[in-house]
């Protein structure tokens, strides 16, 4: 019974831990509304001398609040020494009043929303923001609430500085921004969490199935084997038939501590390994139930 209780308790504890793990993993998963990241393909065209150069690359990412649309235009810089376009009075050097244009703006100095609004108010078709110096070509999806009507993408600092230098040299640069691929960075976390939970579930079910049918049978077999070992040990214990003159029959000797009767001639007694004696009819059932001497607790299976 003790083994069964332990096994049942172990299963209950494991089940409880597995349930708590599942809840933790589910709560740790990202919100189903988590945004995907959309890359931006930039088709860059400019002329150097008589050569027309065209570059196509997955150079940027769309902002979180940007429409996912194709947009094109000549690339224009903010006027003045500061390229962050944080001042609402910032103007842009447009080549022609009717040509569509894209603002190339440096990150920093104010929020993305403010930069984008400044360019949008001046008539930009879209906004390209390049990252801080020292960040290489690292990009991330910008947050710019309130500017959902204009395309906004981020490109790396290296690519941004390359475009900046071309335009500052008077090179006419045109860019077509197209929607690239969708990435879901939270998906790997979701898959890993799901895999961990499923692995734990399968492991628990395997152990549960392995132990559940085995537990009761194992306990029963163990008890049967123990009884058989006790019977075998009892059978090896010495027997005597008391005769007149034996010291056990003397008045000052102890009685049988199991039945409390005095010993009489012709009584059959069992002598344990600890040398204590008892009526055979009394001690054999006792040993089957307890397997120890009633007086000194000596275990007959350990001697």
From Swiss-Prot:
Superkingdom assignment: Eukaryota
What PROSITE patterns has UniProt attached to this entry? ZF_RING_2 (PS50089)
| Family annotation (InterPro entries) | PA_dom_sf, PA_domain, RING_finger_E3_ligase, Znf_RING, Znf_RING/FYVE/PHD
Q: Record's CDD domains?
A: PA_GRAIL_like, RING-H2_RNF128-like
Q: What is its main location?
A: membrane
List the glycosylation sites: 43
Q: Which Gene3D superfamilies match?
A: 3.50.30.30, Zinc/RING finger domain, C3HC4 (zinc finger) (3.30.40.10)
Which first-to-last residue range defines the signal peptide? 1-34
Intracellular or extracellular location(s): Membrane
Q: Which BP terms from GO are recorded?
A: ubiquitin-dependent protein catabolic process
Query: PA domain location, by residue?
Result: 65-167
Q: How does it sit in the membrane?
A: Single-pass membrane protein
SUPFAM superfamilies associated with the record: PA domain (SSF52025), RING/U-box (SSF57850)
Show the stretches that span the lipid bilayer: 186-208
Q: Which UniProt keywords apply?
A: Glycoprotein, Membrane, Metal-binding, Signal, Transmembrane, Transmembrane helix, Zinc, Zinc-finger
MF-aspect GO terms:
ubiquitin protein ligase activity; zinc ion binding
Q: Which GO terms describe its cellular component?
A: cytoplasm; endoplasmic reticulum; Golgi apparatus; late endosome; membrane
One Pfam family it belongs to? zf-RING_2
Zinc finger boundaries on the chain: RING-type: 256-297
Q: What is this protein called?
A: RING finger protein 148
Q: Which organism is it from?
A: Bos taurus (Bovine)
């Amino acid at each position: 019974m003790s083994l069964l209780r332990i096994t049942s308790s172990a299963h209950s504890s494991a089940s409880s831990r597995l349930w708590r793990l599942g809840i933790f993993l589910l709560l740790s998963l990202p919100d189903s509304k988590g945004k995907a990241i959309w890359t931006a393909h930039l088709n860059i065209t400019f002329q150097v001398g008589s050569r027309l150069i065209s570059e196509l690359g997955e150079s940027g990412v769309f902002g979180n609040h940007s429409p996912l649309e194709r947009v094109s235009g000549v690339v224009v810089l903010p006027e003045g020494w500061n390229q962050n376009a944080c001042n609402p009075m910032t103007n842009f050097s447009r080549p022609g009043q009717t040509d569509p244009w894209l603002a190339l703006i440096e990150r920093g100095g104010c929020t993305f929303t403010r930069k984008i609004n400044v360019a949008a108010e001046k008539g930009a078709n879209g906004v390209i923001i390049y990252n801080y110096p020292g960040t290489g070509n690292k990009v991330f999806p910008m947050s710019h609430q309130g500017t959902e009507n204009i395309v906004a993408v981020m490109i790396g600092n290296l690519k941004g500085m390359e475009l900046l230098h071309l335009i500052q040299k008077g090179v006419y640069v045109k860019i077509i921004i197209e929607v690239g691929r969708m990435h879901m960075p939270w998906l790997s976390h979701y898959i890993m969490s799901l895999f961990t939970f499923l692995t734990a579930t399968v492991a628990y079910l395997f152990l549960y199935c392995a132990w559940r049918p085995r537990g009761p049978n194992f306990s029963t077999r163990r008890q049967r084997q123990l009884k058989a070992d006790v019977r075998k040990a009892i059978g090896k214990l010495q027997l005597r038939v008391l005769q007149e003159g034996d010291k056990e029959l003397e008045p000052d000797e102890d009685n049988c501590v199991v039945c409390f009767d005095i010993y009489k001639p012709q009584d059959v007694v069992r002598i344990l390994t600890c040398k204590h004696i008892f009526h055979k009819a009394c001690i054999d059932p006792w040993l089957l139930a307890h397997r120890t001497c009633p007086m000194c607790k000596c275990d007959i299976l350990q001697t």
